[in-house]
């Protein structure tokens, strides 16, 4: 078991869609933009808000700053509480603490909001360290957040980067962990787009909280790489349990999903397209060896 575990917040510990997307919707209205479909705003969950306003709505830096200010008008009052913990998270945190792990939160969300949310859900006591961004926009890159969390863990406990694992749901979490020299685990129940976590080079991908529990309490042995191509597979991913997929050495492959339960079910069906919400809530998995989309099949739990 890893002694030091960093958790992302949004899309990893909790589902913040209503609060974040509702607050983005509120900010856009101040610019005369009406976006009634919250699903279309899901890409705002995870990365820095300024970047997202510029990327998805072509805002100038000045407009993006103003949009963030409007966003916070709503989020700071009601939005941060329009949020739910994923089932099983509280028990997982309790059991990790009882097992002796040191836990931290490493989020791109401002620290003041992270603290409020953790207290609101009654889970603040499980975390030794909480690191987020600053309200002035500094330290909002995931690498910076992870490095600050590592600095505090090293100062307090003497932790080394290779003794730490970062758990998150977006490519930013995986890339930040890799840049900081830590291990990483990606959760597929969050807000990643199809193929995003594989492309980012996640060491392990878990489908649900039970899979995350299996890896975190099961030991660091899940990170021992297996030889690609076992059992005739041409991709770089190997099944490490019913809810866990492990990178066996070919991070660049986008089609490396295998069904650990019912390999033949629903073969040839097309996956939901362009919706991270559907990707999150269902168990559509790629088993193909062609394009990034591959051949998709339903493992038994529809959206």
Where do the PLM segments sit?
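Helix-loop "lid/cap" segments that line or gate small-molecule binding pockets
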Residues: 27-28, 48-61, 117, 145, ...
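Metal-dependent phosphoesterase signature
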Residues: 54-94, 99
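Conserved Lys-Pro-Asp/Glu-containing loop-to-beta segment of HAD-superfamily phosphomonoesterases
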Residues: 142-174
């Amino acid at each position: 078991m890893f002694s030091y575990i960093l958790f992302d917040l949004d899309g990893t510990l909790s589902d913040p869609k209503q609060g974040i997307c509702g607050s983005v919707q509120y900010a856009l209205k101040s610019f005369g933009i009406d976006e009634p479909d919250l699903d279309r705003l899901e890409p705002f969950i995870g990365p820095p808000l300024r970047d997202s306003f510029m990327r998805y709505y072509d805002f100038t830096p000045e407009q993006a700053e103003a949009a963030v200010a409007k966003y916070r008008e709503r989020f700071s009052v009601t939005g941060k509480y329009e949020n739910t913990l994923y089932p099983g998270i509280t028990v997982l945190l309790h059991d990790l603490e009882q097992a002796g792990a040191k836990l931290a939160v490493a989020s791109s969300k401002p620290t003041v909001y992270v603290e409020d949310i953790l207290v609101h859900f009654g889970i603040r006591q499980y975390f030794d360290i909480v690191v987020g961004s600053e309200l002035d926009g500094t330290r909002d890159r995931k690498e910076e957040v992870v490095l600050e969390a590592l600095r505090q863990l090293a100062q307090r406990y003497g932790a080394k980067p290779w003794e730490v694992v970062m758990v998150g749901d977006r490519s930013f979490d995986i890339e930040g962990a890799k840049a900081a020299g830590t291990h990483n685990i990606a959760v597929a129940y969050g807000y990643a787009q199809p193929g995003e976590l594989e492309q980012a080079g996640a060491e392990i991908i878990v489908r649900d909280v039970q899979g995350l529990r299996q890896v975190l309490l099961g030991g660091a042995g899940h990170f021992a790489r297996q030889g690609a191509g076992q059992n005739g597979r041409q991709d770089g991913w190997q099944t490490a349990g019913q809810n866990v997929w492990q990178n066996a050495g070919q991070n660049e492959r986008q089609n490396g999903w295998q069904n650990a339960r019912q390999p033949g079910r629903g073969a040839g069906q097309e996956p939901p397209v362009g919706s991270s919400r559907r990707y999150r809530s269902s168990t559509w998995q790629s088993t193909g060896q062609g394009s990034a989309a591959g051949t998709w099949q339903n493992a038994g739990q529809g959206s």
